[in-house]
């Protein structure tokens, strides 16, 4: 049973990580524009970016279109590792809980706690990569540094900037995946009831996976958005050192109270929701694509893993006397 548990967890983790990698790459230019737009905080009328599209046009007008992909390698690495850890932890904890209660059906509360625990493990282990990718994205176009240089610019403690908010934001994917999983189970149960028991297993269509992913992510994003923006500002690249000679300005304290005070003072209550539309667009598309791709390749991944296990078991039997 233990072997089956590990194999199924690895299958879930692998398919989830591949889905995350592909969705991250497809939507990366939008993510870069969104991050730079969120990171800027200035008094109304003095903003460099009034609209999200201003970031995109700046890249084009300055001849740095490829800079929309600055930090893509680090982001993909962080995305793949974090998704693998998350889906492995989520699947592993979920199956352990099922074994403990003797049922495969898990309630919403238990599912939420399991997802939050998986998210917390992921945040702690991948925070330096998350910080580095945010700094690269929010750097001036054409001036992004490499991964090692970005991480070693400050102390190693700076590599964990925003960890507190990251742990708080575990409620975001926890809500999303819980809602998605519950809706998915309901749809599959209805599909099984309509189909013949001897027929092939019912699977979620790509379109329905996309819709469920979008619905489950929207509510979580709206609720947690103020924390999301604060996190981006804490992790953003500090270009003020290079720009001090041109236009001196007081730096924002890279702490939760510091960024909250800065947003409140310069932008007011609505500042906590600056870039919300872009965040919803990006996160909904990203999550929906991730889950859609994951659902479509999970079966293939599981078959490959079973084939590999069968190969090793067969070799072991041939070697044994």
From Swiss-Prot:
Tissues expressed in: Expressed in stamens, pollen grains, seeds, leaves, cotyledons, roots, stems, flowers, hypocotyls and siliques.
Entry's localization field: Peroxisome membrane
GO molecular function term, any single one: ADP transmembrane transporter activity
Any one Gene Ontology cellular component term annotated for this protein: peroxisome
Gene expressing this chain: PNC2
The protein's role, per its UniProt record: Peroxisomal adenine nucleotide transporter catalyzing the counterexchange of ATP with AMP. ATP is needed by reactions that generate acyl-CoA for peroxisomal fatty acid beta-oxidation during postgerminative growth. Required for the beta-oxidation reactions involved in auxin biosynthesis and for the conversion of seed-reserved triacylglycerols into sucrose that is necessary for growth before the onset of photosynthesis.
One GO BP annotation of this record: ADP transport
Species of the source: Arabidopsis thaliana
Protein name, UniProt field: Peroxisomal adenine nucleotide carrier 2
RNA-binding listed as a keyword: no
Domain of life of the native organism: Eukaryota
